[in-house]
């Protein structure tokens, strides 16, 4: 087997292979490997790949495997003769057809989402996620087709999120105006009942740092929120997700509390539990305590009272410079 050294100026990798006719198993193994890499056949036994990071080594492995089966193998570093040939090479790797077929399947699946239970929704998301991941892996030159597919995939996941978490707020674009805390004293605050991470943390923050005399209304239907109540953590609420910030983080920024080290770190924990992100060590423990308390306690008032002590302790922990 002949192999040329890597060159930073080389744009393409060409693998030429001739396997013995008797090596049917090796031939099938080689073909599967070439297909998985996303190489394109210029003709029988001649396969082209762009010389991009991460592609040379697996192509070299296929070449070595073919040579071990008494195949004749040449791995070459080549360049396009001119811009036209470069464009022709790139066109060989256009994945528009694959994306179009995947989007047709996704569109068909979306039409059935409302009739699916939670388990089926998750299965559908995983199946189509694997589909787009497989195309992404071999899409070396993303274009408008890939952008359309990514947009449709985001919309599809958003539709599933709405079905899995009815009432959950969705981030909207916009700035977070600074609020005067003196104008928010002794107010009634409202959010969805059956408190979970973001809502219970918001209620604690309101009572502890914003409005000590706040009263809370736990809504069965957010459409019944009184006009004079300050809604939080639902779509259309006064305080809800903005951009990539969850409601707790929006409250911090609104009332100038985001410079508090302990609250900022607590916000990171709430964020990862609510929408994901960089792991926070304390997150899983808080989630477990909250889940147990919600099962054990009779209502949201009792839940806020008890979990408030936990959040007090976490705030102290996050504020302390000492690490135990």
From Swiss-Prot:
Function: Together with ChrA1, this protein reduces chromate accumulation and is essential for chromate resistance, possibly as a regulatory protein.
Induction: By chromate; induction increases when cells are grown in the presence of high sulfate concentrations (3 mM SO4(2-)).
GO biological process, any: response to chromate
Listed name of the protein: Protein ChrB
Superkingdom of this protein's organism: Bacteria
Keyword Lyase: no
KW Kinase (keyword) present: no
Keywords on record: Chromate resistance, Plasmid
